[in-house]
Curated annotation (Swiss-Prot):
Lineage of source species: Bacteria, Pseudomonadati, Pseudomonadota, Alphaproteobacteria, Hyphomicrobiales
Protein name: Probable malate:quinone oxidoreductase
Gene Ontology MF annotations: L-malate dehydrogenase (quinone) activity
GO biological process, one term: tricarboxylic acid cycle
NCBIfam families: mal_quin_oxido (TIGR01320), PRK05257.1-1 (NF003603), PRK05257.1-4 (NF003605), PRK05257.2-1 (NF003606), PRK05257.2-4 (NF003608), PRK05257.3-2 (NF003611), PRK13339.1 (NF009875)
Enzyme class per UniProt: oxidoreductase
InterPro entries (UniProt xref): FAD/NAD-bd_sf, MQO
Record's keyword terms, sorted: FAD, Flavoprotein, Oxidoreductase, Tricarboxylic acid cycle
Recorded superkingdom: Bacteria
Enzyme Commission (EC) number: 1.1.5.4
The organism of origin for this protein: Bradyrhizobium diazoefficiens (strain JCM 10833 / BCRC 13528 / IAM 13628 / NBRC 14792 / USDA 110)
Length: 512
């Protein structure tokens, strides 16, 4: 069948997940005249990593994730990375609050719930680490109100399942901060996409697989699309393309032929949770309890026992158990990894394989892990867990970045990176962590990278500051403004907030 006629649009968003939905919402707020098309291979939005059960749903603010606070050689704790992640989540909170304020999202309870964030450790060395971590973090206003205890009875109050049945033979410790959240990113994505396509000039096309990206003379992009249901092909021309396709971003970036993408590769990691839906068990646990990963293990191995609230129902999640699959997407192909190999990224791929043997060994061990081994890991956080109450839940795929490096040949990075054209007409989001929680930060980074000329006082800047009042201000440095922002967004989002110290209240009010 001949290709359908070409279509013209200002913006094409590839992938209907939380990243594309967030960027699309930002762009339409800043420039209502923009025409935007979203292209998704599957038959609905949020079916890959954004799906409710394909991620842990943690509102990642680096409250409880100890891998963000490494110990320096001198024994002190470095909280710089944690602070950065912490205030990046504030950007998302402000963005969501803005959308609720203008009626784009009716009820925050449809996607976000207050759930305390906890860190839990056992053993003398780990207890000492958590004590030092708490001292460093609680001294900063971003972690004001964090609690710490080494009393098993207090921990049992905070997280009964964690302590019930635990022997008192070794020391334990925990921190808690009540401002933590559980976020249903699947529900949020549906809300954002629904809001976007309700506006003039915006549309989402499902069952639309992007098969080619061609740069035309004049700087526009021609996006070749195949309808997976009918087999028909068509093309769309756009001034700007964002590839927010999760694990599928790398193959699409390679299709673009951009020299800036040369040498990049991907390392796919699969994941499995244990899931409990028994209401009698779940009502005894209301927290996200993160443990400390074993020495030398990768970031995705951090164990946690989480409250999840999805569709109004409470569940428990434990994991993750990592594994290896050559798929780049949960609905992808086992050939994804092999088809991503190019002459330019062979050296980086081989270098990463050489330098990360421990990671490979860890993943192989996870793949070969028996059910009894998985339950033994659960037992460390829920000593009285009964295997019959738990079932396996397959998580989404994560594709970590492999990038070329002059000295080592290639580097494996556990983060995200924007890679795109030098004229800023196309950009792809590569990587995975910390993921959906920082979607607003990533969207703003795209704006700064690709639409810098519009971020002026006479163009988009006033509106951007209306959407994100802290834009241009460091919440890490400005304690009063940070407290003010958090109090405001907590009220709108209906989540818990720690009241600011009475002596400091006038200063915050004055800033407002």
């Amino acid at each position: 069948m001949p290709a359908a006629s070409d279509r013209e649009t200002d913006v094409v968003l590839i992938g209907a997940g939380i990243m594309s939905a967030t960027l699309g919402a930002f762009l339409k707020e800043l420039e209502p005249s923009l025409t935007i098309q979203m292209l998704e291979t599957l038959d609905d939005c949020a079916q890959e990593s954004s799906d409710s059960w394909n991620n842990a749903g943690t509102g990642h603010a680096a409250n409880c994730e100890m891998n963000y606070t490494p110990q320096r050689p001198d024994g002190s704790i470095d909280i710089s990375k944690a602070l950065q992640v912490n205030v990046e989540f504030d950007l998302s909170r402000q963005f969501w609050s803005y959308l609720i304020g203008r009626g784009a999202i009716a009820d925050p309870r449809s996607f976000i719930h207050p759930v305390p964030h906890m860190s839990f450790v056992h053993g003398t060395e780990n207890v000492e680490f958590l004590r030092k971590r708490f001292k460093a973090m609680s001294a900063h206003h971003c972690y004001e109100g964090m609690e710490h205890t080494e009393d098993p009875r207090k921990i049992a109050e905070w997280a009964p399942l964690v302590m019930d049945g635990r022997s008192g033979d070794e020391p334990v410790a925990a921190t808690r901060i009540i401002t933590g959240t559980d976020v249903d990113y699947g529900a949020l994505t549906h809300l954002l996409v629904g809001h976007l396509v309700s506006q003039p000039g915006c549309a989402v096309h499902y069952n639309s697989c992007v098969t080619g990206l061609v740069r035309e003379q004049g700087g526009r992009w021609r996006i070749e699309v195949r309808d997976t249901a009918s087999g028909e092909t068509r093309s769309v021309r756009a001034k700007f393309v964002f590839i927010g396709a999760g694990g599928g971003a790398l193959p699409l970036l390679e299709k673009s032929g951009l020299p800036e993408a040369r040498g990049y590769g991907g390392f796919p990691v699969s994941g499995i949770w244990l899931r409990c839906d028994d209401p009698e068990i779940n009502k005894r646990h209301h927290a996200k309890v993160y443990g400390k990963a074993a020495v030398g293990s990768p970031p995705m191995s951090v164990p946690h026992l989480d409250t999840r609230v999805i569709g109004g129902k409470h569940s428990l999640l434990f994991g993750p158990y990592a594994g290896f699959s050559s798929k780049f997407l949960k609905h992808g192909s086992l050939l994804d990894l092999f088809e991503s190999i190019r002459p330019a990224n062979v050296k980086p791929l081989l270098s990463v394989a050489r330098d990360n043997f421990d990671l490979t060994e860890y993943l192989v061990g996870q793949v070969l892990q028996s059910e009894s081994h998985r339950l033994a890991a659960l037992d460390e956080y829920f000593p009285k867990a009964d295997p019959k109450d738990w079932r396996l839940q397959v998580a989404g795929q994560r594709v970590q970045i492999i990038k070329p490096d002059v000295k080592r040949g290639g580097l494996l990075e556990f983060g995200t990176e924007l890679v795109g054209a030098d004229d800023h007409s196309l950009v792809a989001l590569l990587g995975a962590s910390p993921g959906a929680s920082t979607a607003a930060f990533i969207a703003i980074s795209v704006l700064e990278k690709c639409f810098a000329g519009e971020l002026t006082a006479s163009a988009w800047l006033p509106k951007l500051k209306q959407i994100v009042p802290s834009y241009g201000v460091s919440l890490i440095d400005d304690a009063d403004f940070c407290r003010q922002i958090r109090a405001t967004t907590a009220e709108v989002l209906k989540v818990d907030n720690i009241p600011q110290p009475a002596a400091r209240a006038p200063a915050a009010a004055k800033r407002a």
